[in-house]
Amino acid sequence: MPIRVAINGYGRIGRNVLRALYESGRTSEIQIVAINDLGNAETNAHLTRYDTVHGKFNGKVEVEGEFMVVNGDKIKVCAVRNPADLPWTDLGIDVVLECTGLFTTKERAGAHLKAGAKKVIISAPGGKDVDATIVYGVNHDTLKASQTVISNASCTTNCLAPLVKPLHDKIGVVAGLMTTIHAYTNDQVLTDVYHEDLRRARSATMSMIPTKTGAAAAVGLVLPELNGKLDGYAIRVPTINVSIVDLSFIAKRATSVEEVNAIMKEAAGSAPLKGILNYNTAPLVSVDFNHDPASSTFDATLTKVSEGTLVKVSSWYDNEWGFSNRMLDTTVAFMNAK
């Protein structure tokens, strides 16, 4: 029997999770039973059919009364503000994918459990009370059946952790600083408008905008041995999708460009990171990674080493599509946890 899933919040991640499910052909593993979103069902169906970043949906999407029908599969559509009031018991929901960005603590996301769901995966960094922060391919093997509310981390942590782990395992990371050069997102503004972050108050389309990110520090939640050793910030740039992590770190021992690249090539070609971490040697640009399902694509052409122990590495990621695919992977791993 497929895992019965509900999506709460049908924005960029919610829609891409659904599209990724059908595009990957994993409907025998996962069935989307319900979508809860305050938006109009017809509008959400239209936004499923047509996407500026990822193109036209390769299938059929219709609205029939209280259902959105995708390739013949009926998905109940709800518009309920309080998750505790959702009909998850009646619908037999196994996992809620919490994609609103609003219910990011176990206490708040736990409302889905009160409504009858068995488990919740938050599509954002979680509060300190969540049972675990998971980056699939790095620490999904630590999941336990007793856990109920977990975080799938952020798109940037999902790029950074698979980049750091092989390097730390082989040559060691003393400390590192990361910059994510990140496509703008819908929490920014088209024109200047009031915002508590004075830089985010500025037009996303006209400037490179430095801003904070917890992605580097969050690696410590996934790889405890690196807790407190990584930090960084984001620079939001005027592109709609695809980002790149630039990581500089001090290695525990002397290394070389050739060794670093060999480590990453080996990691990308073997479990558990195969398909999660890719390896690139072509002179590509960001648009070439649009709609790439990998969490992280290491760019061997950008590796630098200075004085043996100062290392710079870079990895590309489709910050929407890769993360949405990992939501599916984590769903299966969570339900199969022992």
Kindly give the residue locations of the regions a language model identified:
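N-terminal Rossmann-like NAD(P) cofactor-binding subdomain of oxidoreductases
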Residues: 1-201, 329, 337-338
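Short amphipathic alpha-helical segments
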Residues: 3, 147, 204, 243-245, ...
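Generic structural signal for well-ordered, non-membrane alpha-helical segments
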Residues: 10, 14, 105, 153-156, ...
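Generic secondary-structure signature for well-ordered alpha-helical cores
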Residues: 22-26, 165-173, 183-186, 213, ...
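Glycine-rich beta-alpha junction loops
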Residues: 38-41, 126-127, 154-156, 180-187, ...
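Short, flexible turn/loop "capping" segments at secondary-structure junctions
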Residues: 142-144, 200, 237-243, 305-308
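Acidic, glycine-rich segments within the central catalytic cores of soluble metabolic enzymes
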Residues: 169, 173-240
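C-terminal active-site/capping subdomain that shapes the small-molecule cofactor and substrate pocket
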Residues: 232, 244, 248-338
